[in-house]
């Protein structure tokens, strides 16, 4: 996990992903400041993220299936708090 991303939204995202997907590797970065002045930007931050995640749960799953699993794990955060999420999801060994 990434200790540099410690805001309340990022913390909740990491907890949910860890609980549902049991990742072997996970890195979540808050990219919000790079989107200042763009649509969905929140001055409070924590609106735009990049996620790199490796989980055995992704074995045999397509890219779209993996993204759906992540969105499902994040639930209401994707609708209420997170404007954009860039995802790199892999199974171990990929």
What does each model-identified segment do?
Residues 2-94:
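N-terminal, polar/charged subdomain of small-to-medium soluble alpha/beta proteins
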């Amino acid at each position: 996990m990434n200790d540099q991303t410690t805001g309340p939204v990022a913390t909740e995202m990491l907890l949910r992903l860890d609980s549902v997907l049991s990742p072997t590797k996970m890195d979540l970065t808050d990219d919000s400041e790079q989107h200042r002045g763009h649509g969905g930007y929140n001055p409070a931050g924590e609106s735009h993220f990049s996620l790199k995640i490796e989980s055995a749960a992704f074995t045999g799953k397509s890219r779209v299936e993996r993204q759906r699993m992540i969105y499902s794990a994040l639930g209401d955060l994707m609708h209420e708090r997170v404007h954009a999420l860039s995802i790199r999801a892999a199974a171990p060994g990929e």
